[in-house]
Amino acid sequence: MRRKASERPLYGTRRRGADGYPTGDASGDACFGIIRGMKMHLSVKAPLSAAVFLVAIIKAVSVDAAGVSVPNTMYDHSDPVDLPKLLEGRDGRRIATAEDWEKVRRPEILDFFTRNVYGIRPVERPNDLRFESIGEDLDMPGIDAIRKRVRISFSGAHGAWGFDACVFVPRSASPGKPVPAFLLICNRSMARFADIDRKRRTEFFPVEEMLRRGYAAAVFRNTDLAKDDYHPYFSANGVAVIQDPPFTNGFYACWAKERTETSWGAISVWAWGASRVLDWLETVPGIDSRRVAVVGHSRGGKTALWAGATDRRFALVCANDSGCCGAKLNHVAVSMSETIRQDNNNNPHWFCRAFRQFNGRDFVLPYDQHWLAALVAPRLLYIASASGDAGAGPWGEFLTARHASPAWTLYGNDGLVEDGPYRIEVPFHVGRVGYHLRKGDHDLTLYDWSRFMDFADRHLR
């Protein structure tokens, strides 16, 4: 049935990929982003004319020598405006040493994101956390690995819950010769994209390639902890109802009956789940739990960043195409990229209710995502972008890697070392902050995984 004009989206709709995230192909919202960027840089306050609007669209995308669409320099290679200072405390004090960072600035930033973006967790590791093997360990000679499955269970004041995880361990690994591991926060169908029986192999979770290069490969499904969809009950309780409303069953029911402005949202729940999987990996013979990398794509990339910020046991944090509220800097005009308002409106369950205070304030935020990325220091951080993923704002993701790097300098380390031009498939791997811009769209591919492993080979071995 054709909708009335009053019911149609004001700025158009966006095509969504396999994980539900808007792809680089956008209509009205993209154009609105271009206009917003032009107004910011040209200080235009009046409505733009149709002619100027058309010029904006034409200039928004350019084509390189290889015929690949890349962000236009005028809009997407600009510098951030009035970027909040990373190395300045809340009281204006200059943060000059690693000790200052650890005692003053890092706790301030972590508290800010907890109370204003992701929400307060009622518990970290539950006292009754249990690991129950699912069946026997399976010898998989076809991929030269042992597959282990587990049910991770726990309970709270109001109920009990659990979720499954899996790891493939190279048969050559042993307690005396443990191997590093990659843990994927899978935000797509496990059967289609991360089949643990390995009957269906995809680039999204290339177990065979990880094993070949000497890494264990672990995975869990984010929605086993918290559903990834909006529920009407959210408007009353501040976080999406998980499983059976109203909190009579399911994950959230373990600790709270009512939600508040700062109650944790789904991203924090998923990140919490990654930490619980790491708890289990610490008990698995043959895995070096001091060298575990957490990886996420899209909303999973946002989750990986928060997991790395809240759990310092993760040695490497890889955020792939994480976009707005992930690795993308907000204080810069990046045409076609997502906004905070869009994330809050489309996925309110990801965040705490307090995060709505920043709707429409992207360019004047009192913080930005380089603060979040810096919480990983002095450990390893990798941010990955895709040239055709306009929604994630590749240039903004790159800028976060650049502007978070001073936190690593405090420890006497290099952050992002730009030892080449910002170009497609020219990775930066020298410092402890890595980055690459892949050719292609919003996805997690073998190219991305290969660069993550190259970086880990260099810094994690």
Each model region followed by its residue ranges:
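Primarily recognizes the serine-hydrolase "nucleophile elbow" in alpha/beta-hydrolase
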Residues: 276-335
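Conserved strand-to-loop "acid loop" that flanks and positions the catalytic carboxylate
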Residues: 377-392, 439
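C-terminal catalytic histidine-bearing segment of alpha/beta-hydrolase fold enzymes
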Residues: 346, 402-461
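N-terminal cap/lid segment of alpha/beta-hydrolase-fold proteins
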Residues: 125-176
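N-terminal pre-domain segments of enzymes
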Residues: 65-118
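Mobile cap/lid helix-loop segments that gate and shape the active-site cleft of serine hydrolases
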Residues: 276, 319-372, 397-420, 427
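Cap/lid segment of the alpha/beta-hydrolase catalytic domain
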Residues: 184-276, 280-283, 326-331
